[in-house]
């Protein structure tokens, strides 16, 4: 079996908003990596045994006395090190160089003139017409290195940053003031490939096929002949988890699909058809709509709704699990960003804006072992594995759907009438986006039910019915987003269809709020 963890990169996080992008790029190259906080111990690094180390950017200033520093062992481990932005600055400071606050801060696009073609910049040039090689990069820094550590040379400059890149080839230490991990840096992926493959010597074994092989073997090794229970929602994470488990243990997997009445139009039937009929999984469908809606009566505060939905789900799942007395393991679709966010919250550095629908987990008394086959994977990797396992691309690439479902897309108190109207309106919106070839041009699109009525006219009659809002956004990382500029004729067609085909809706509006200041979901 291929050892997919044999070569691996350790990324030390100094707090940059782009740090997870570094990890995703390294994985995209085909090499395993992990993301750890900057203050790890020498013992932890030795135990991980990285093939190379990357120091991320960060919001702090190396000119401040108590700013974060890389563990000294990083520079004594005998492996290549790449410092990015703040990572380059702390490398310079810790190895005897000097940094200062810059008079000319650089934020945005910049052109770096390469001064030497070391191994990091091998074969890189974004401007073939210039006499010297240049790179088109993305800068985001206020400090700069002003004196090199001993043994280093300048490998890149900009008009306002005389040391935009540096290297000590003998020790295989490299620093870049720009961000190769973002797509704005034209040859960023090639630069990271030069480091990970060319300099560190990593083999590209982190592929979907190898991951599936290893995950299936690990599941068999972990659970043996025991039975496993999984809450299957039909979302990407739980779906891929189900297929990995099914491949490993077959009928010993029991999937529980809780139909909470807060799903999209016909979604429950689609889940049963896909996983029961097509893939042959053991699925128990629990029709719990009344139970959820009863629990949500009178609750209009968004966070209280989320908590209630989460609690009822646990109660329903608990009731079903008690019927499966031979089950010894609980499977969850935890992915790597969940692990990172959980670790961050334990340090006290994370601020809860909206609670995650899985927070709290199952009751302690259930005493089940935990199986998390996706724990090492980013979402894009989960999709690639799902595709390799036979899931249709249109399902894997659907827009995100919140864990509480329509519970956070019906504003205020949730009622069955509201959910039914919203389901129909949303289905029309999505159908028309597909028809107009706009669905994959936007990052997320959905309809929101507003608990207000508006006067309308249908034929010769007056109507006084509900209002819905259409929402479509464009984003790269969902941390910030722009509202999508859908064509007016498309919006008009969607509005006309909803008002004419959904009895009970008299007005359709379009949300033109960006994030920030608004969030993508309304609740």
UniProtKB/Swiss-Prot annotation:
Pathway: Purine metabolism; GMP biosynthesis; GMP from XMP (L-Gln route): step 1/1. SUPFAM superfamilies: Adenine nucleotide alpha hydrolases-like, Class I glutamine amidotransferase-like, GMP synthetase C-terminal dimerisation domain. The active site is at residues 85, 179, 181. It catalyses: XMP + L-glutamine + ATP + H2O = GMP + L-glutamate + AMP + diphosphate + 2 H(+). The keyword Nucleotide-binding applies. It is an enzyme of class 6 (ligase). Residues 206-398 form the GMPS ATP-PPase domain. Keywords: ATP-binding, Glutamine amidotransferase, GMP biosynthesis, Ligase, Nucleotide-binding, Purine biosynthesis. One of its GO terms (molecular function) is ATP binding. InterPro entries: Class_I_gatase-like, GATASE, GMP_synth_C, GMP_synth_GATase, GMP_synthase, GMPS_ATP_PPase_dom, NAD/GMP_synthase, Rossmann-like_a/b/a_fold. Its EC number is 6.3.5.2. ATP binds at residues 233-239. The keyword ATP-binding applies. One of its GO terms (cellular component) is cytosol. Residues 8-205 form the Glutamine amidotransferase type-1 domain. Catalyzes the synthesis of GMP from XMP. Homodimer. This is GMP synthase [glutamine-hydrolyzing]. It comes from Actinobacillus pleuropneumoniae serotype 5b (strain L20). The gene is guaA.
């Amino acid at each position: 079996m291929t050892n997919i963890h044999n070569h691996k990169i350790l990324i030390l996080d100094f707090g940059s908003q782009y740090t997870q992008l570094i990890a995703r790029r390294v994985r995209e190259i085909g090499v395993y990596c992990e993301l750890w906080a900057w203050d790890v111990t020498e013992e932890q690094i030795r135990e991980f045994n990285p093939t190379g180390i990357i120091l991320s950017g960060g919001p702090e200033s190396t000119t401040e006395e108590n700013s974060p520093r890389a563990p000294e062992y990083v520079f004594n481990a005998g492996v290549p090190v790449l410092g990015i932005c703040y990572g380059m600055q702390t490398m310079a400071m810790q190895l005897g160089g000097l940094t200062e606050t810059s008079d000319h801060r650089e934020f945005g696009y910049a052109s770096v003139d390469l001064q030497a073609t070391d191994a990091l910049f091998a074969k890189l040039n974004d401007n073939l017409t210039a006499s010297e090689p240049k790179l088109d990069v993305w800068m985001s820094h206020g400090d700069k290195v002003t004196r090199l550590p001993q043994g280093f040379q300048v490998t890149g400059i900009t008009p306002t940053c005389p040391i935009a890149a540096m290297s000590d080839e003998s020790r295989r230490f490299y620093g870049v003031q720009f961000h190769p991990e973002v797509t704005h840096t034209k040859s960023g992926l090639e630069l990271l490939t030069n480091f990970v493959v060319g300099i560190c010597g990593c083999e590209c074994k982190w592929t979907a096929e190898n991951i599936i092989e290893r995950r299936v073997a690990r599941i068999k090794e972990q659970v043996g002949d025991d039975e496993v229970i999984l809450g299957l929602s039909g979302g990407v994470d739980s779906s891929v988890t189900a297929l990995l488990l099914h491949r490993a243990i077959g009928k010993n997997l029991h999937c529980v699909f809780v139909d909470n009445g807060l799903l999209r139009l016909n979604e429950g039937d689609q889940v049963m058809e896909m996983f029961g009929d097509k893939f042959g999984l053991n699925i128990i469908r629990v029709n719990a709509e009344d139970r959820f809606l009863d629990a949500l009566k009178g609750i209009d505060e968004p966070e209280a709704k989320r908590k209630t939905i989460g609690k009822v789900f646990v109660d329903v799942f608990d009731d079903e699990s008690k019927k499966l007395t031979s089950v010894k393991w609980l499977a969850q679709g935890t992915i790597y960003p969940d692990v990172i966010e959980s670790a961050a919250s334990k340090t006290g550095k994370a601020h809860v804006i909206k609670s995650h629908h899985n927070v709290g987990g199952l009751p302690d008394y259930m005493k089940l072992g935990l199986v998390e086959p996706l724990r090492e994977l980013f979402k894009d990797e989960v999709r690639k594995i799902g595709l390799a396992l036979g899931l249709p691309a249109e399902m894997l690439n659907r827009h995100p759907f919140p864990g509480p479902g329509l519970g956070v897309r019906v504003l205020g108190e949730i009622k069955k009438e509201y959910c039914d109207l919203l389901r129909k309106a949303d289905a029309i919106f999505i159908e028309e986006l597909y028809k107009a070839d706009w669905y994959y041009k936007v990052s997320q699109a959905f309809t929101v039910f507003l608990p207000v009525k508006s006067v309308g006219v249908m034929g010769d009659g007056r109507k006084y019915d509900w209002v819905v809002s259409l929402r479509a956004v464009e984003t790269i990382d969902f941390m910030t987003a722009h509202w999508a500029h859908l064509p007016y004729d498309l919006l008009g067609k969607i509005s006309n269809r909803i008002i004419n085909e959904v009895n009970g809706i008299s007005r359709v509006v379009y949300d033109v709020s960006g994030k920030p200041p608004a969030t993508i979901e309304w609740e």
